[in-house]
Amino acid sequence: MANKIKDGRKLRSQNTSDHILSTIIKLAQEGNKDINFDLIAKETKLGARTIFRHFKDKDALLKALHIRIQESTIDGFPKIYEKDSLTKRMNLLISYLCDMYSINKELFYWTAINIVQSEQVYKNAMNMHKLHRKNIIKILPEIKNKDEREQEAILHILSFGFWRNMSFFSKKKNKEIKDILLFNLKKHLKTR
């Protein structure tokens, strides 16, 4: 409750910033590759000057966008308990990752397209990559017991790129991908 904004102007300002960021995420998830200030202004029904009042430049906007996406993605990782079996943890993780990749695939594509055009997008992507790896290892600490080559193989199996290849090129459905991932993880982590 202490963090609640009580000032009406500050609350409206925060709501407007949230609306702008939510709109950008929606545009990316819909497959828009060229998201610019004019498109954001049109979709939010706000003037471009209003957007610039909230975010001084494109980098500031991208930083705020990264924080928003990071919070929702990282907060979504399954909560695990030490007593949970390895198989249960693998299933929870695989289910979360496949569903998250499916929902956000266009956002991942947008990032890949824009990573070479923007230093800030590159920094954001590298930070998210590190956070994903950290959270995966937190859920499956058994990965740390493997040599570096096998760790990389396991992390690759759990990556968006692997999911995309299975989904797009191999035309697998999420259920099939989850089964393939579980089979591969069990093989690498030696479970039955």
Region spans (language model):
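Short amphipathic alpha-helical segment with a characteristic S/N-K-E followed by hydrophobic residues
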Residues: 57-63
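Amphipathic alpha-helical packing segments from all-alpha helical-bundle domains
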Residues: 106, 119-152, 179-190
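Amphipathic alpha-helical linker/stalk segments
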Residues: 26-29, 33-35, 63-92
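Basic, helix-initiating cap at the start of DNA-binding domains
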Residues: 1-34, 38-43, 60
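Amphipathic alpha-helical segments used for helix-helix packing
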Residues: 66, 78-79, 98-123, 164
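Short hydrophobic/aromatic patch on the recognition helix
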Residues: 46-55
